[in-house]
A protein has these predicted regions:
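Core segments of cupin and vicinal oxygen chelate
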Residues: 3, 12-58
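A short, acidic/glycine-rich surface segment
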Residues: 40, 61-67, 103
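Hydrophobic pocket/interface hotspot
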Residues: 19, 23, 79, 96
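Vicinal oxygen chelate
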Residues: 2, 5-14, 46-47, 66-152
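Acetyl-CoA-dependent GNAT
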Residues: 57-60, 130
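Flexible, glycine-rich phosphate/dinucleotide-binding loops
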Residues: 38, 62, 133-136
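Short beta->alpha connector loops
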Residues: 36-37, 60-61, 108-110
Length: 152
């Protein structure tokens, strides 16, 4: 493969400070303001060793408010972030639960565990991590509960 991963994803926000506070508090992400002038803000939010969110805030632009159902959002539907480890996944999940940013349901896709969440602007995103309980060759459909997170 000639690629090493995704470098960045550009997203729109209505409130850069709220956005960077959320990603900083939940994911320990750092941010750097790059440009701010004439109703235009660009901030880089580092979400991995080589990956970032390029966060744009434009005065008068309301596109960030459009949160339609999954598969109705245009060409890019959502982004998925990779947790560094299962321990990190659990810590992030707890932080998201504390902010009511997720229902906490973890999907077992086989090789990957997945948790959906919503950011401060309503942008739906996903947190993933390698599944330590995977059975080689088994891939599960969406909605398959991860046994390690089932209570009761």
């Amino acid at each position: 493969m000639l690629l090493g991963g995704i470098n960045h994803v550009a997203v729109l926000t209505g409130d850069t400070e709220r956005f960077t506070e959320f990603y900083g508090a939940v994911f320990d992400a750092s941010s750097t303001a790059v440009q701010e002038q004439d109703g235009f803000k660009l901030t880089m939010v580092q979400v991995g060793p080589t990956a970032e969110l390029n966060v744009f805030e434009l005065a008068g632009n309301t596109e960030w408010q459009r949160q339609v159902p999954m598969f109705g959002r245009g060409r890019l539907d959502h982004l998925a972030l990779e947790a560094e480890s299962l321990v990190a996944f659990d810590e992030i999940r707890n932080r998201l639960l504390a902010r009511d940013a997720t229902d906490g349901f973890v999907t077992d896709f086989g090789p990957v565990l997945s948790l959906f969440f919503r950011g401060p602007d309503g942008l739906e995103a996903e947190l993933c991590v390698a599944n330590p309980d995977t059975t080689p060759g088994v891939v599960n459909p969406p909605g398959t509960p991860a046994i390690r997170y089932v209570t009761g």
